[in-house]
Design a protein with these regions (language model features):
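Iron-sulfur (Fe-S) cluster-binding modules
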Residues: 49, 61
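Short, locally clustered residues in the helix-turn-helix/winged-helix DNA-binding domain
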Residues: 46
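Twin-arginine (Tat) signal peptide motif
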Residues: 33-43, 62-63, 69
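Short, flexible active-site loop motifs that bind/organize anionic cofactors or intermediates
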Residues: 31-32, 41, 126, 155
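Structured, non-membrane catalytic/scaffold regions adjacent to prosthetic-group chemistry
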Residues: 65-244
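N-terminal secretory signal peptides
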Residues: 1-40, 50, 54-56
Length: 244
């Protein structure tokens, strides 16, 4: 499934910037403050449980704690989840839903010919891309557990594997001044994503879910997985990324 290839948006080896409240303090007080912040950071990094029947990588823990999400316990009622905003939910304790229980809306019967299929990356890039699915699956992969909510209808907590947008943008070499990505799919469906803050989200183009090839009704060959956004923005049958 490529679980060992966890290259999601935050780059590996990223340096975490600790609290700077010690500026202007004495050397002894500075040392105590640095110790306190490191200890508290480590407390946040350990003890993350793995739930469900699949071992998935959680990627790099975000250093932005300003907007705390609500941590939900294992077994939290689905009838309550479907009324919630995914941007407010910490889903790390929730079970992985069996794939045969996944709900879906929108187009479900579009057939893609892999012989001619290409994912294009165009717009403000130095190196436009036109990639087959085989070429895409050979790029560094990432596996992430992300919650999909169709408000009032269904909720899917899935383990998604694919290529991160960051990886694709590195291949295409985004030009200075670029601000947005337009993710396009079948039936002219488009979702716009700001480049600012892209590295702090779990965002990828998935070709597998719960260790299985992404089925046609869920957007094969590529589906946008977009943390903190409702399922209506998770474009299916993705075939183009336009940088603007």
């Amino acid at each position: 499934m490529g679980i060992h290839h966890d290259h999601l948006l935050p780059t590996p080896g990223r340096v975490v910037k600790f609290c700077t409240e010690s500026e202007g303090k004495s050397p002894r007080k500075k040392a105590r403050l640095r110790m306190w912040t490191r200890r508290n950071f480590l407390k946040r990094c350990v003890g993350i449980p793995l739930s469900g029947f699949i071992l998935c990588s959680w990627g790099v823990i975000s250093t932005s704690w300003a907007k705390a999400k609500k941590s939900l316990p294992q077994g939290f009622p689905k009838e309550q989840l479907i009324q919630m905003n995914p941007a407010d939910i910490d889903n790390r304790n929730l079970e992985i839903d069996p794939f045969d229980k996944f709900g879906t809306t929108g187009a479900t019967d579009i057939t893609i010919d892999l012989k001619t299929y290409r994912l294009k990356v165009t717009g403000k890039v130095d190196q436009p891309l036109s990639l087959s699915l085989d070429q895409i699956t050979k790029l560094p992969s990432t596996t992430q557990i992300v919650l999909l909510i169709c408000p009032g209808v269904f909720v899917n907590n899935g383990c998604w594997t694919g290529v991160s947008l960051k990886t694709l943008l590195q291949e295409a070499r985004t030009k200075t001044g670029a601000q947005f990505l337009d993710i396009k799919g079948a039936q002219e469906k488009v979702t716009r994503i700001p480049l600012k803050g892209l590295q702090e989200k779990k965002i990828l183009l998935a070709y597998r879910v719960n260790e299985a090839t992404l089925p046609r009704k869920h957007g094969f060959p590529l589906r946008l997985v977009l943390e903190d956004h409702y399922g209506s923005e998770w474009v299916k049958y993705v075939d183009e990324i336009v940088v603007s």
